[in-house]
Amino acid sequence: MSPNPCNLNRSNRRNAFWWLLILLGLSLFVGWKFSSSSPFYSDITELLPQTQQQPEVIALEKQLQTQFSHQMLLLIRSTDPSNQSSSNKIKYNNDSSLELAHTLKNKLLTSSYLVDTLDQKNLQSNFQAIYQPYRNQLLTPKLREKLQQQRAEDLAQTAAAKLFNLTSTPRPYAFSEDPFNLGGQWLAAQQSNSKVALRNGWPTIYAARGNWHLINLELNESPFKIEIQNDIIPIIDNFKLQLKKDGRHFELLESGLIFHAAAGAKLAKKEISSVGIGSIAAIIILVLLVFRSAVPLLAVFIALSSGLICALAISLFVFDRIHLLTLAFGSTLLGVAVDYCFHFMLNSQQLGCSQRCRKLLAPALATSALSSIAAYLLQLATPFPGIQQMAVFSAAGLAGTWFAVIALGPFYQPKNSNTIRRCSVFFQNYVQPLYHKFRSHHRLYMGVICGLFLVTALILQHQPSNNDVRTLNTSGDALIETSRKIEQLLQPNSSARFYVVSAASEVQLIERLEKLHVALQPLRERKLISSEQSLAQWSPSLKQQEEDHTLINNKLFQQALPKLCQLLSIKNCSAFKQSAISQLQQGLTPQHLKTLSILDPIRLIKSGQGVHAAMLLKLNPLTTDDDLRSIAATQTGVNFVNRIDNLSNLLVSYRQAVSVYLATALALIAAILFYRYRLCGLRILIPMSLSALIGLAVAAQCCGITVFHLLAVLLVVGISLDTGIFYHEMGLNSESWLAATLSSMTSILAFGLLSMSQVPVLHQFGIVVLAGISSSWIIAPIFFSTKKTC
C-alpha cells in the first residue's frame, strides 16, 4: 500500500525543525538587542537624507541644530496675588516666582542628563576674565561715534556723573583699571539685544502680570533618546502636579526639542498600538468567525510572529536601531502577511489535504512573495534613509511569513466550518453571478475600466504636489502655541534663516562679517531686522581694534582723563593714567572665546576651502527671503540659508526619485508577470495598476501628492498583486474570493485606523492604502473566471 500523500513525512518535520531553529536564533538576537540598548528612536530628521549643499553649510547647520536641539528653556511665573495687592489692582508676587524657579531648577539638575552651562555667575566671571586685557581696544558702534563727536570735557563730565549714579552700567573692573568703564559698556552691549535682564542674579523678563523667570539648561545627550525623555519630563510633570495640590497659582512655559520629541514619541507609540493591536484584534475576530477553531488562529499567529521576528532581526542587524515610524509602517504589513495564511488554509479546506495545497500554491506563493520583496528591495537604491529602513523591514517581514507558511503549512489539518459553507453559498448565489453578468457586457466592462483609468489620470494630472516639510510635524497644537509664546517673550535669533560667511582666513572672515553688518543697515531701518549675532560683535577685526585703541588713547586717556581727575580731585593723575592705559594687546580673536558656550551657534568651523561662520538674525515676521538674499548678493563670500525651504526642496527631489523607483518597481513586477504568465499577466497587472491609481487619486484630494502617498502605493501594489496571482492560479472560486475578502477586510480595518492617525505621514499613508485595497477587492474579480484560463 502506498503512503497517504497527506500524511506528514520526514522532510516536513526536517523543514519545520530548521525553520523553528532559525526563528529561535533570530529571537535570541532580537532579545539581546533589546536588553543591551534601546532599539528604537524617534528623531524624524534621521529618516531624511543629507541636504545636497556645500559641506560648510551642512556643517554649520549641524552645529546650529546640535546647539538648539540640546537646549531646554522654561519660563515660570507665579500668579499668586501679592500681600500688597489692593482691591483695585492686583500685584503679582514676584518673590514667589523666583522661589518656584529655584525649586524647579534644583529638581531638574538632579537629572544626570542636564547641565547648567549658562550659569549666570560663572558666565559673567568668564566674560570679565576674557575681556579684561582687551578693554581699552574694544568699542561698540554707538560709543565709537560718541567718542568721535563729543568733546573731551563732556566725556569727562559724563564719566564722573555715572560714578555716583546707582542705575548706570555696572562696573566689572576697578576704577583705577577702567576709569571710563569701557569694559562694562562693552559687556553690557553684548547683552543689550536680549529681553532678559538679571534680577537678584536670576534671568528675568519683566511683565505687567508678573515677572517671568528663565531656566536655561542644556542636555548632554540627544533629546530623542527615550530614556532621557522618561527621566526629565516626569520631573516637570510631578512639579506641576505638586503645585496644583498645594493650591499654588502659576504659569509654566516649556520650549525645547526634547518636549517635541517626547510628544512625537508618545504619539508614535499610540499609533503603533492602535494600528498593530487593531489589526491583530481584527484578525482574531475574523479567523474565529470564519474557521470556528483556534487552530487557524494559531497558524496565523505563528506566521505573523515569524514575519515580525525576521523584520526586527534583519532591520536591527542592518541599521542597529529602528525608527518608531518604521515600526508603525511595518505593523501595516500584518494584512499582507495573513494573506498567505488565508489562501493556504481555505484552499486546504477545499482540497482536504495541506500537502497537496502546498504543492498547488507553491508557485503562486513564490511569485507573489518574490515580486513584492523585489519591489521593496528596489527602494534600497534610494538615498532616503527612511525608505531604506522601511524597505528592509517590509521585505524581511514578508520573507519570514512566506517561509513560515511553506515550512509549517503541512502541519495544518483542515476542518470545514458552517461559516465557510455559508460564504461558499453566498459566493455562488450572489457574487459569482454578479461578476459573470458584468463580464458578459463586454463593452460596458471595457468602458468602465477605461473610464476609471481616464478619470484617475485626470485627477492626478491636476493635483498639485505637497512638499512642505511641516507635514512631518508630530507636535500638538498646545506645544506649538507654547513655543510661539516663548518666542514672543524672548524674541530669539532665528535658527531657520541665517547667513553663512566664508573666507580664506579668520582675519578675512571677521572683516566680511563686519561688512555684512554694515550692509544690513537698510533692513534695520525698515524694521525687518532688529539685531544680529556674529563673531564680529564679540571679537572685532584686528584692524578695528587698532583703530579703537588709537581713538581711546587719544580722546580719553590723553584728553578726557586729566579733566576727569580734576573733577574728582585726583592729584596723581599721571600715575593713574600710566596704570590705566595699557599697550595694544596682540588682539582679541575668536580663539580667545572658545570657552564661552553661549557662542556655540556662531562659532567658526574650518574646512579645506577656508573658515566659515554663521550670522544669526532676529527677524520681523514680515521679512522675506528675497530681502535677505538681496543683501547676500552684494557681499563676497556670503550665502543665505533657509533650512525649512532646503528640507522642502529635498522632499521635492526625493518625491521625484521615489516616483522613478515606483515606476521601475512596477516595470519589474510586470516583467515577472509576463515571464510567468505571458499575456495573461495583464489580468493581474491592470487591476493592480488601477487600484494604485484610485488610492493615489483619493488621497491626493486632501493635501496634494506627497512622497508618503507614493510609498503607500507600493503596499497597495503588493496586496493587489497577491490577490491577482491567487485568482489566476486557483480561479475565481469561493475559497480564493473568501481568502481575498478576509485579507482585504483585515488590511482595511488596520489601515482604516491608520488613515485616522494624527501623524500627517501615517494619515497620508493610510488614506492611499484604504482606498487602494478597497478598489482592488472590488475590481480584481472582474478579470478572472472560475477556472484558470491561461
Where are these regions (language model features)?
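Solvent-exposed, non-transmembrane loop/terminal regulatory segments of multi-pass membrane proteins
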Residues: 32-80, 193-202, 462-504, 718, ...
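Hydrophobic transmembrane alpha-helices and their membrane-interface caps
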Residues: 296-341, 681-724, 752
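Pore- and gate-forming transmembrane helices of large, multi-pass membrane proteins
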Residues: 351-382, 730-758, 775-777
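Signature of alpha-helical transmembrane segments and their immediate interfacial
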Residues: 2-42, 408-468
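Juxtamembrane segments of multi-pass membrane proteins
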Residues: 446-567
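Hydrophobic alpha-helical segments
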Residues: 302-417
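Extracytoplasmic
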Residues: 122-294, 535-670
